[in-house]
């Protein structure tokens, strides 16, 4: 075969054959030979995107950690706090569907940058009430004529006002700063000329293969919004007609209902169940649980890459992590603490149990002349280990400051159920729970860390399953619908109905200055535990059954198609090998040594 023939064959092989009536398409990925901008690298994009997620996690995490502070600051019940927390997701609903659909065909980095700017402005608006509202007025003790000291709120204001405003400002600055790199990124990142086509990844783990020529922007044509909008409803119909995608969407929605409700009220649960302060509860969650979740997500990604897990394997890993995680979660029912001893609410003034709560239960024969308020909540811990609603119902006559603590003396009600020392004094604040509660709290943290790691281990396999069950050109749109469904059906309602049910366990309500009901001051620990954990387990159980259905449909619909594809591919390979052998034999027969008499003389 002469040189010109070889060149023609090579030229024919390199030339793509286009169907009749179909425009030629140009790949979005620029070649490595073309001059790329300084920021047009994958590492720059990943770094910028990681910074964006850091800013987003900082904003959402801070909002979750201030749930109890918002409840006390504005004196509102948990159900209304859930509405405020759920409204954080409402802003995404206005644009997420259209951005996910049209954004896949436009300049994605600039769209992300614009979103970061809007997020920065939003966090700045969250900080505005800190500068325009009046300072919080704490409930203070109104002393009688023979008292020597009143409780001053000055120290509390100086320690609680500053971090709120500083954190709100920091969130806004970080979100605005995160938008800068995306304005300098190109529309598409460069791709190497030779891209390995791994048989294991394309045949073992994918059942819908990427074909970039099917959905790239036509060369020389400007994309019009109306032309893209025509395929919106057909694309939406295709997504909801995909059984694996639809079932996985239902599974994730139910599972995120349990996760959103659990995470939103976890600091409150630690405060009420184990008697920890709000700052300590949030610090422990950030120090232990968040690294466990990050490690679980990273481990899931490493496992998917190292072992080259197939789609069915990813579904099994997702199901296994959910089952094992919720089995561990069941053990938390046994790791609870009993109610604190509060006079008139959980115990009588004599220290006996049980007690039936009613409005007059807060008063006793030891404090008939004190004229105490029924609505005030200013807990005081007596020397007898019983917490009193305030120093007034405890019958305290005098008070004195000892450092940062305020000590009350001559408390007649404390003396009734006094300890062996016979001391009738008390100190501001609630009494610590029994001696076994700190140990229970330690066990709770250990189980919580393991559960967080186990549940997050299935995050990446589930995400890979979501991407591989749909057409490549609909990935962005499918992710947008997925995110929209999670936010509408889980992010918004879950904190609300969790808060409504948690409010049913309240024993002592606070009241606003106008007389209306405010936030809950004291919860029934046992009822709170069963509502909080029980609702989470019920939702988790439903998601497990839906995950089993996803795995069943996946095996039924796609594994059989995958086997048929492999069978056809093997037949094609055998046929191609046979043709190559015949062609090789023909080439050998055309050599001069087989036809010595017919050798051409040049």
Swiss-Prot record:
The chain crosses the membrane at residues 44-63, 83-103, 110-134, 140-156, 239-260, 281-304, 309-332, 445-467, 477-502, 537-554. Residues 193-214 have a biased composition (Basic and acidic residues). Residues 1-43, 104-109, 157-238, 305-308, 468-476, 555-602 are cytoplasmic. The keyword Heme does not apply. NCBIfam families: oat (TIGR00805). Mediates the Na(+)-independent high affinity transport of organic anions such as the thyroid hormones L-thyroxine (T4), L-thyroxine sulfate (T4S), and 3,3',5'-triiodo-L-thyronine (reverse T3, rT3) at the plasma membrane. Regulates T4 levels in different brain regions by transporting T4, and also by serving as an export pump for T4S, which is a source of T4 after hydrolysis by local sulfatases. Increases the access of these substrates to the intracellular sites where they are metabolized by the deiodinases. It catalyses: 3,3',5'-triiodo-L-thyronine(out) = 3,3',5'-triiodo-L-thyronine(in); L-thyroxine(out) = L-thyroxine(in); L-thyroxine sulfate(out) = L-thyroxine sulfate(in). One of its GO terms (cellular component) is basolateral plasma membrane. This is Solute carrier organic anion transporter family member 1C1. Keywords: Cell membrane, Disulfide bond, Glycoprotein, Ion transport, Lipid transport, Membrane, Transmembrane, Transmembrane helix, Transport. GO terms for biological process: monoatomic ion transport; sodium-independent organic anion transport. Pfam families: Kazal_2 (PF07648), OATP (PF03137). Disulfide bonds join 366-396, 372-392, 381-413. It comes from the Eukaryota. Glycans are attached at residues 400, 410, 423. Belongs to the organo anion transporter (TC 2.A.60) family. It is found in: Cell membrane. GO terms for molecular function: bile acid transmembrane transporter activity; organic anion transmembrane transporter activity; sodium-independent organic anion transmembrane transporter activity. InterPro entries: Kazal_dom, Kazal_dom_sf, MFS_trans_sf, OATP. The keyword DNA damage does not apply. Residues 360-415 form the Kazal-like domain. Residues 190-216 are annotated as: Disordered. Residues 64-82, 135-139, 261-280, 333-444, 503-536 are extracellular. It is a multi-pass membrane protein.
